[in-house]
Amino acid sequence: MAGLLQIRDALALHGNVQALQLSRQLAAPLPLVQAMLERLIAMGKVERIEQDNSACLSGSCKSCPEGQKCSSTVVYRLK
């Protein structure tokens, strides 16, 4: 089972990481990873960043059927 230290180490290694990526990397359930990230945020060790993807490089995101889902991405990083 993944612990707070493994989450912290993965963030240190990879920089900005989505919770789903951490979940897959650590083979831990996504709700568990999200809860641990929230705990690390409360401890002042991690920050949550909402990235705006509206400036798509190809310019085709507005017509993309997946466009609504990827309008913003939440990533986490160490403080």
Curated annotation (Swiss-Prot):
SUPFAM superfamilies: Winged helix' DNA-binding domain (SSF46785). May function as a transcriptional regulator that controls feoABC expression. One of its GO terms (molecular function) is iron ion binding. Iron-sulfur cluster binds at C56, C61, C64, C70. The lineage of its organism: Bacteria, Pseudomonadati, Pseudomonadota, Gammaproteobacteria, Enterobacterales. InterPro entries: FeoC, Tscrpt_reg_HTH_FeoC, WH-like_DNA-bd_sf, WH_DNA-bd_sf. Gene3D superfamilies: Winged helix-like DNA-binding domain superfamily/Winged helix DNA-binding domain (1.10.10.10). Belongs to the FeoC family. Keywords: DNA-binding, Iron, Iron-sulfur, Metal-binding, Repressor, Transcription, Transcription regulation. It comes from Serratia proteamaculans (strain 568). This is Probable [Fe-S]-dependent transcriptional repressor.
